[in-house]
């Protein structure tokens, strides 16, 4: 009885192209505790992610604090490479697709979608526009993301935890989203496999054979600033009683996934 031929080059388990996740950014807004930043870096690195951005952390030197270094364990390189920004708009300036992670639904916020669907959407966007970046945005430990921060994103996702006790710490939430991204990069899920989880349909332009480059976060913010000034100038927007016009306009245009030439 002959033995089966051995593979000349065994396929490593759970191997994925590192470039598939290299342009995924995790953004932490207003983080208070250095240990959480370190634990976040560790959670990211275990799933092959390395791009960490901090917006107005409580401590400017948070990444070099002993508690952060200790919780990062073997992921101190992710801490060392972390970038700090004064505002979320600055952190998303070169990002063309952003997902807000929040347990609370927000009025006039972006369309909601399950974590695995957001992961699939993000990597699909990178497949069409490999020169771009996508981001997952997390809020402060005690307060989460503000309404204004959520409204800057294209999708909103939440983790379906137990309603009896749904409190996740920051690093746990990051670990789950990072896992969803890695699983998608390994080919473990598909957007089409979860139609019941989807609350939106992609515009036709996103499945075009030659899609136009998506607008960056900076370009989109400039578009909204110009639009607001124009509406004020013609008297359509009352500065004393703006109501919900601009949040509605923001949601409308972000849902359309604007291209660079459209803004």
What are these regions (language model features)?
Residues 1-263:
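Post-transcriptional modification and biogenesis factors for structured RNAs
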């Amino acid at each position: 009885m002959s033995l089966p031929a051995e593979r000349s080059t065994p396929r490593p388990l759970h191997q994925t192209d590192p470039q598939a996740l290299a342009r995924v950014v995790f953004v932490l807004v207003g983080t208070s505790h250095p240990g959480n930043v370190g634990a976040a870096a560790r959670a990211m690195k275990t799933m092959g992610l390395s791009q960490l951005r901090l917006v107005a952390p409580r401590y400017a030197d948070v990444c070099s604090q002993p508690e952060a270094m200790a919780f990062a364990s073997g992921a101190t390189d992710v801490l060392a490479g972390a970038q700090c920004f004064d505002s979320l708009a600055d952190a998303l300036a070169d990002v063309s697709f952003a997902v807000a992670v929040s347990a609370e639904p927000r009025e006039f916020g972006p369309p909601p979608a399950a974590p695995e669907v957001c992961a699939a959407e993000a990597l699909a966007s990178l497949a069409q526009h490999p020169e771009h970046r996508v981001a997952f945005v997390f809020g402060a430990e005690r307060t989460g993301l503000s309404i204004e921060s959520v409204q800057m994103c294209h999708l909103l996702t939440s983790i379906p935890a137990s309603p009896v006790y749904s409190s996740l710490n920051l690093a746990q939430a990051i670990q789950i989203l990072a896992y969803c991204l890695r699983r998608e990069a390994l080919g473990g899920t598909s957007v089409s496999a979860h139609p019941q989880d989807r609350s939106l349909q992609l515009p036709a332009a996103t499945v075009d054979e030659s899609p136009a480059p998506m607008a960056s976060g900076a370009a989109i913010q400039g578009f909204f600033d110009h639009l607001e000034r124009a509406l004020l100038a013609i008297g359509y927007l009352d500065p004393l009683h703006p109501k919900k016009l601009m949040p509605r306009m923001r949601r409308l245009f972000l849902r359309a996934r604007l291209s660079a030439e459209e803004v």
